[in-house]
Amino acid sequence: IDFESEITVVTGDLTMGATPEQGLEAIRLVMLANDVSLRRLIPDELAKGFGFLQGKPATAFSPVAVTLDELGSAWQDGRVHLKLQSTWNGRRVGHCDAAPMTFHFGQLIAHLAKTRNVRAGSIVGSGTVSNQAVEQQGVKTWPNGYSCIAEKRAM
């Protein structure tokens, strides 16, 4: 079993074929998520073409969601520019910067809306918040830690 610390957004209604800009305009709330993964089940599921059905048994969300204005200057270019702290068995293991997402939330939402209407209340996740390694004297280190166990094992 693995955890994945993520940022998520809750959308309003959006029509199929929406642009990334329209995706950003549809964001109503921001919250945190722990996207649970059963890593040993995922390879077989993907090989069968079923996707992440049994390998993703549950997702837990923060008890509070905030509007974009509550984030102030931390909300820029469709990304949350804050650190996300991850703990594992009560021990802090990650303090990763959420800003360097490969795709901003508008792009993620537009991708979702490519083949369907997106209804109010839809939740879109950032994927695991992860930061790149820093090389010092030929050795790679991850000063911000990690946001999932699989990432730690890959270090």
Where is each model-derived feature located?
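Glycine-enriched loop-and-adjacent helix/strand subsegments that border the catalytic/binding cleft
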Residues: 1-111, 139-140, 144, 149
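Active-site pocket scaffolds in enzymes
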Residues: 119-155
